[in-house]
């Protein structure tokens, strides 16, 4: 049987819908990665600003006094190095996550919304930290001021460094959670793809199978007349067999069993005796009496 236009349209619409969904997901992923690159650049600028402020503070002190009396700058150098190392690790994890998402563009959109919210939160934190650093630079730290202002500036920078470290740690945790969710969504997407492929195959097979004509179905289904005829034949055969069986029993064994037990239970005593009185002349008559004279 030839395919109808509706079946052809359904078959053509399935791959077109899949292509449109893939394009939408790739566009959303591209926008997400653009925002991610913006956050990377903001973080790099923030690190540069922190290093610049640290350099200004270190230059204001004498080298001997810094090594002997103020060990906070050494700790600050170590913290900045740790910060840069963690930043590099975060960038590596984000690049790996980017490659994973490019390989599987059919991940769920809910994961992308959570990533966008996280990036917006981090951008706000970065902008606030950068604003505080700009305020420190605008103050114009003078080299002739006392040690109290320098200690306060160092404490502020140290607090800023703590905030940046905490935000980076939160970023690492969130990236790990998002990667785990991404893997889970990838597994679910593979399962749904397998089920959808099976369903589409079944639908295609159903559309391709020719429909049986109505005349063929009518021929296979038996007409009601034949059903009634079969039932009537069975009833007649059963009736004939029962009557012949009773007649054979009466002929060879006698009618006492029928009149004393069977009919007595079915009809009652009075009707049974009346029936016997009606049939008694025929039972006692001889064959010669029935013959014509």
UniProtKB/Swiss-Prot annotation:
Query: Which InterPro entries does the record match to this protein?
Result: SMCO2/5
| Any one GO cellular component localisation term in the record | membrane
Q: What is its main location?
A: membrane
> Coiled coil where?
116-188
Membrane topology term? Single-pass membrane protein
Compartmental location? Membrane
* UniProt key word Manganese: no
Keyword set, alphabetical order: Coiled coil, Membrane, Transmembrane, Transmembrane helix
Q: Which residues cross the membrane?
A: 234-254
Keyword Transmembrane part of the UniProt annotation: yes
Q: What is this protein called?
A: Single-pass membrane and coiled-coil domain-containing protein 2
Species whose genome carries this gene: Macaca fascicularis
